[in-house]
């Protein structure tokens, strides 16, 4: 896989900006560190600005991008909006303010412009951020599974309610559902999150969801190819 120059900017509650930049291989989740032009040395954000409170951010790649997040003590602590360069018109607010801790990192998955990786990024009323992913190879129903555990959404978020979310996929007209559906144990749709192509429309968190999640629920979408 080729490398690409990934850039970003994080905004803190006190007005501090944290510029990010790194050469990252497409198709491999990697650390995104601070931009050495402005921060002298490349550092992970938790070591560069411990105690600062993130309130907004955007991360952009050359050809394709699936997701970005703050990794803290092994968990997804905060999800950062993503896009291909030249698409985003703003630095979006995060779902909730997040105070950086020493050791925190930005993790990002960049892609080629033809990679079909899909992601569903959600935030719950209980304050939990999670990412669900899939890599389809053809037609059929594709389940999105937890990035860190490989579990279904019902196992990961049992008893919680999704209140914010966005989805990412380049598949466009190949998708025959209204984005990613959350379905209950009987297959009934209890919520839907659009899947946007980050090369054409920067995915941003919608604030209008009220999607309950229980055991045996799934996140999935249907493809015609």
Regions found by a protein language model. Name each.
Residues 1-225:
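Beta-strand-centric surfaces of beta-sandwich/beta-rich domains
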